[in-house]
Amino acid sequence: MRKWVSSTVALLVSVLTFYGCGGGGQQSAVPRNRTFIADCSNQQDCSGQFKDYASFNPFLLTGTTKTGWNFAYEPLYFYNAYDEGGDNIIPWIATGHEYNSDYTAVTVSIREGVEWSDGQPWTAHDLVFTINMLRDHAPSLSFSTDMQAWVKNATAVDDYTAQIELTASNPRFIFSYFTNNFDNGIPIMPKHIWEDKDPESFSNFDMAQGWPVVSGPYKMAISSPEQRVWDVRSDWWAAKIGFRELPKVERLIYLPYMEESKRVQNIIANAMDTSLDLRPPNIKSIIDANPGVSTWTGKDLPLGYLDWWPVCLGFNNLEPPFNDPEVRRAVNYAINREQLVKIGWQGAGTSSHLPLPNFPPIRTYTDGIQDLIDKYEIGVYDPAKSAEILQRKGWSKDGDGFWNKDGERLTMVVDIFGIFNDLAPVLVAQLKQAGIEASFRLTSDTFTRMAQGTARAYMMGNGGSVRDPYFTLRLYHSRFVQPTGTHAERFWRWSNPEYDAIVDKMGQTSPDDPELQNLFRQAMEIWLSELPSIPLVQWYHRIPQNETYWKNWPTADNAYINSAYWHNTWLLVLLGLEPSQS
């Protein structure tokens, strides 16, 4: 394996020239100690090879790999959830914004001197074009459903002033959609490239024309089935106007998605600089084998940081038998979360009773509903109560100990991503012990199965709230529900009109308003009583940070941002990294 790794690195970064199918001509040599290498984090779209190598449209619901658009298109703001010393908001393309008195409109001020990679100015016209384009193409594009729900119209007052009229009061509109944090943040497109295109089919890729046109400090050099390569560009607007220095990382190479064992071997061999977050035994094996690798917490547990993505057992809530909240509650009683953590993660983690991350700002809300968690017994492991519910619903156990009704067993096939390979076997074993004929599967089309609802059960994180609970609760709003077989932007397919109305009010209520606490409690009373998904564990990012070639990684003591390279804050890490070797 080491031989294979070494030959791969030599092929990619030591030759004088290399070429890419679909675009990218002769490239100058960049030494390994100025090159950053990682694999694609998206199994469905880049396992074996990049399926989107000839496309760069981040709005396609079919999936677009995060191998560029998450740092090539810069936001109005960044948000750092881990810096406890500041206000956490980092102005970027915007210099400020102001709401009207009832939060039904917001005016955004754009920084002068921002440019696209083709030299055209980045203006308010680009922002309003992107917003209106998404609103007008709902629900066919990513982010479009929310824009349709919230935006009446967006206009450019002048090149540096945008005004957005909202359909209702929304004091967190800019933070929710145009402040990059974790996976949140809508990429803003250049109007002069997109305005005469159909965004539902436009590839945004033609390297002969200089596409994609981006605003960030890198230009696409190669995009082929085998790799995606970005090179730093010296004409980045932020360097020209003195806003930021050029990144020291001169070249980024993304390789196709790898199984975790290959990631481990590549990191140990210094053939990669980071990877997708790893399972506890694997991150420890890297730390033990390679003294040049560290983590967010150095060599100390938990070897990572708490992420915003608490994991639930989800269902297609439109389809039987899991469209019945009582059946879902029976499943809840069959799950031993402490055992999940103890066996699946070797004790290196925490269970979760809510779909919300255990961040300090969120705890100011969740601490106040502990009585509801107790009332609905979320986290209670009680197979007898599970059995009582199923018996009452007409199920009885067959000769093999599985629940059966009308000649059919209660089965559950849980679709998973590779990152759940440690938890899923434990979960399935628990469900089997409770009489549910359970299994799990990891397939190349997992994401599609979840999005279309053909996955009747699945493990999935809740990527939403970081400051207040609204953004997670809105993931369960019925406006995202699509029929089984139709691609849905959110997968839960649960509908409750009373819940919708409360969440709509939450969206119109300022996080500073005490009423938000009351609305949160009302919404969670409904959510916990119906349990559209079953909370399992808080999620941790145990990300290896290879310091052989790069230093000044984000850490618990230097928390300038989190270190996930697939997140929409990755640009800040690229700007923070320093060469370890002269």
Where are these regions (language model features)?
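Alpha-helical secondary-structure segments
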Residues: 37, 123-130, 159-165, 216-217, ...
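Detector for C-terminal structural segments
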Residues: 40, 67-68, 225-227, 232, ...
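Aromatic- and charge-enriched surface segment that lines or borders ligand/interaction sites
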Residues: 95-140, 157, 163-165, 263-268, ...
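Ligand-site clamp/hinge motif
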Residues: 111, 206-208, 236-289, 428, ...
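N-terminal lobe/hinge region of extracytoplasmic solute-binding protein
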Residues: 39-101, 132, 213
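Gly/Pro-rich hinge or "lid" segments in bacterial periplasmic/extracellular proteins
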Residues: 78-84, 182-246, 251, 261-262, ...
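Extracellular/periplasmic solute-recognition and catalytic clefts
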Residues: 134-137, 141, 153-154, 221-231, ...
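Surface-exposed binding/hinge segments that line
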Residues: 145-197, 548, 556
